[in-house]
Amino acid sequence: MRIAILESIVMPAGHEVEFDRILVEELKKQGHEPVFFVPERFPFKLDYHCDVDYLDGGEAVSYAGVSRLKRLWLSLQRERRRIAWLNSACQKGADGKCDAVIVPTNSWRVMRSIRHSILKDSKVPFLFMFHGIMPKDRQRFCDGVKSLKEYPNV
């Protein structure tokens, strides 16, 4: 199977980079063909030796080194772009560019974005992975999961 990894978090290094590397290696070991779906001009920190397909919707948004006011503006921009990236990934799946999509880094905000995207009616399965949920976000997370139960490919 051709499995897309949708990555939109600009990461200097650390657990996201390592997690993606492990995911790619495991998919290859199981005989799958991983491909990355990423925002345009995405700054990879590691060469995963996979095909890359760029998503419509704008570049990835980073909060690194910005003021509180600018962060608020960027969070609105990131939300709008996240919906566009999800829509683009969904369309790529419908066009046969992958058999399934894994989204390895998520939050309750992503679940909110799903409800505002065409992804709820996706023809290909989307697997959203969550790790490191903050205790203060627990209820939002649980509510977000419940809100997506009616969508069979999410």
Model-derived segments and spans:
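Alpha-helical membrane-targeting segments
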Residues: 64-87, 112, 143-150
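Short hydrophobic segments within beta-strands
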Residues: 6-8, 37, 103-104, 129
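A short, glycine/small-residue-rich beta-strand->loop->alpha-helix junction that serves as a flexible
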Residues: 7-21
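N-terminal strand-loop element at the rim of the active site
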Residues: 11, 26-77, 108
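Membrane-proximal helix-turn-helix segments that form the acceptor-binding/catalytic region
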Residues: 87-91, 133-154
